[in-house]
Design a protein with these regions (language model features):
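Short, structured segments at the rim of ligand-binding sites
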Residues: 1-139
């Protein structure tokens, strides 16, 4: 059973090396962004050779949302911002993880995911399952 410690506080900053688990990087980064947590994520050198250059793609799309983000050849640094830009279209770069990672931001601001069908590569029912937990999905 997992539960939150009663004294839990959202961290101000996290530093994490994902060299052994690079495929969770996009989810970790977007979670930090949505929660306003500064993060330094390292071990990301293989993200440049996935479906797309995931480091550059994350930087591009996060900046549309107003993020203060910098990348190197193997890391991403994200600083918290005051307000997330609304009604932004997120490009997926034909990468299923881009679509799935950015989708939960809809809990904070309306967003559009371009090329949403890309999720079928790994999670055919992704949009159906989001609807089941009360996400509004149109288009």
């Amino acid at each position: 059973i997992l539960s939150k410690n009663k004294d839990y506080k959202v961290p101000i900053k996290i530093n994490i090396d994902l060299v052994e688990n690079p495929d969770i990087a996009q989810t970790v980064i977007i979670t930090c962004f949505g929660l306003g947590i500064s993060c330094e994520i390292t071990g990301l050198q293989t993200l440049k050779i996935k479906e797309t250059d995931r480091l550059q793609a994350m930087k591009n799309e996060l900046r549309k949302l107003g993020a203060d983000v910098e990348i190197t050849k193997n890391s991403l640094h994200l600083s918290p911002i005051e307000k997330i830009n609304k009604n932004i279209s997120i490009n997926t770069y034909n990468d299923h993880r881009m679509a799935m990672a950015f989708s939960p931001l809809a809990m904070l601001v309306p967003i559009t995911i371009n090329n949403p069908e890309v999720v079928t590569k790994s999670y055919k029912n992704f949009w159906k399952d989001l609807k089941a937990i009360n996400f509004n999905i149109s288009g």
